[in-house]
Amino acid sequence: WLQEQGYLKYSKDDPETVMDIGQGSSAFGMDPSRIYINLKDKYPLGTVDAADYEKIRDEIKAGLEELRYNQSSVIQQVYKKEDLYEGPFLEQAPDLVALSNHGFDLKGKVKADGVFGHSNLVGMHTQDDAFYFASDQSPCRSIFDAKDIILNGLKDEHK
C-alpha cells in the first residue's frame, strides 16, 4: 500500500529486503503492522524534513483508515506512537501502528504482487482472542502448559 500510494520506493526493480528501500521513500513498513516515517536525521536515506513529519504521518494514517477490500474496512484503528508508547525509547517506536480488522493480516512484505493476496503462512496473531487469568494461588506456568490448560478447561465446561 505504501508503495502504491507513492510513500515507498525501492532502489531496484525486484526488491528482496528492506535494505532495498530507495531514495525518495517517505515511509516504510515492517512486520507486524509498523510504519516508520523516513526522517532525514533519523535514517540513512531519510527524505522527510521534521517540519513535514506530522503532515506525512496524518496522510498515511487517514489513507490506511480508508483502506477497503471488497467493501470491507481493512483497518480497525491506526495508532500514533505517542498513543501506545512512552518513556526514554519513544523515538525508536514505530510512528504508526495499524490494527487490522479480523480476517486481515498486515505485513511489511517487500516481495508482494499487490496489497491483497495470500502467502504460504496461514494464521495470524490477534490481540483479543484468548485470555488467561492467573492468581497468587496458581502454580507457575510456562507456554508449554497452554494446551493442557485449554483442553482441561473445555472438558470441565462440557460436564
Map each language-model feature to its residues.
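C-terminal accessory region downstream of the catalytic core in glycan-modifying enzymes
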Residues: 48-71, 126-159
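Secreted, luminal/periplasmic, and some membrane-associated catalytic domains
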Residues: 1-104
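Short, low-complexity, polar/charged sequence segments that are solvent-exposed and flexible
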Residues: 3-4, 54-57, 115-120, 150-151
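Low-complexity, glycine/alanine/valine/leucine- and proline-rich hydrophobic stretches
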Residues: 97-147
